[in-house]
């Protein structure tokens, strides 16, 4: 872990070569509601050892998630498949950019083994973008889902997928056909900020991906999230909510953007807890089954508990 931190701090240009030419953005001091304790618990160490033992990557580490100490201490980790190197270079993201290695055919089995070792009731599996692959890694996702089902049949599975922008429709169909319990794809920000924040993606393509997943399997829960503090305004966030609901998204997450390095997109401002509470109220008013909107909310934060509440919310709505 220490070696990894040293790598990230000493040679950021190797991790993010596409950002090396950018001027440094001043990182504002974090308010009290953002600060978290350093991970030190035995549970954290046990989770780390299992992940290391299976030679797996986690988005918790690669993206520099502020909740890693809390989640890992409880034995929760978000598996990141298909390597640690992404083919995109989004200005908000701390995952390394470059040329990925070939897929590891044994990775799905190792993920399933780790899920079993950790005793997870709910697992989140995500990935880097793999624009170098014809199917964007869809079959690898499907293999991972099937491996977890075989090894840990009682575990519910959530996938947080890339946009499959350069693939045919069969990529999405492959993932949905593997029957994950939750299909998650993040819109990340308001459409007006895409050219700067998410230049390799297309807002309405991502929105349609979520809509089509629900069309392919109406029983699947769909989920999406955005960050705030990137330069958006409240009306833009409310419009994204409306767009998601038009695509029948069930679960919305909203969290504060935190700038990984001075070369990344600047933090425009820190959104207050009161504003997050306002977003949560507005989202429930628009019909979302489940909403998580706090400064430290991330896609997989408390995902297991939230899935149970999501399932209950659907049952109540169907029974109403």
UniProtKB/Swiss-Prot annotation:
Record's keyword annotation contains Ribonucleoprotein: no
Localization of this protein: Cytoplasm
Cofactor note: Binds 2 [4Fe-4S] clusters per subunit. One cluster is coordinated with 3 cysteines and an exchangeable S-adenosyl-L-methionine.
EC nos: 2.8.1.8
EC primary class: transferase
Domain (Radical SAM core) ranges: 72-289
Alphabetically ordered keywords of this record: 4Fe-4S, Cytoplasm, Iron, Iron-sulfur, Metal-binding, S-adenosyl-L-methionine, Transferase
Pfam families given in the database record: LIAS_N, Radical_SAM
Annotated spans, Disordered: 1-30
Keyword hit for Metal-binding: yes
Binding residues for [4Fe-4S] cluster 2: 86, 90, 93
SMART domains in UniProt: Elp3 (SM00729)
Any one GO molecular-function label of the UniProt entry: lipoate synthase activity
The family this protein is said to belong to: Belongs to the radical SAM superfamily. Lipoyl synthase family.
Protein name: Lipoyl synthase
Source organism per UniProt: Cereibacter sphaeroides (strain ATCC 17023 / DSM 158 / JCM 6121 / CCUG 31486 / LMG 2827 / NBRC 12203 / NCIMB 8253 / ATH 2.4.1.)
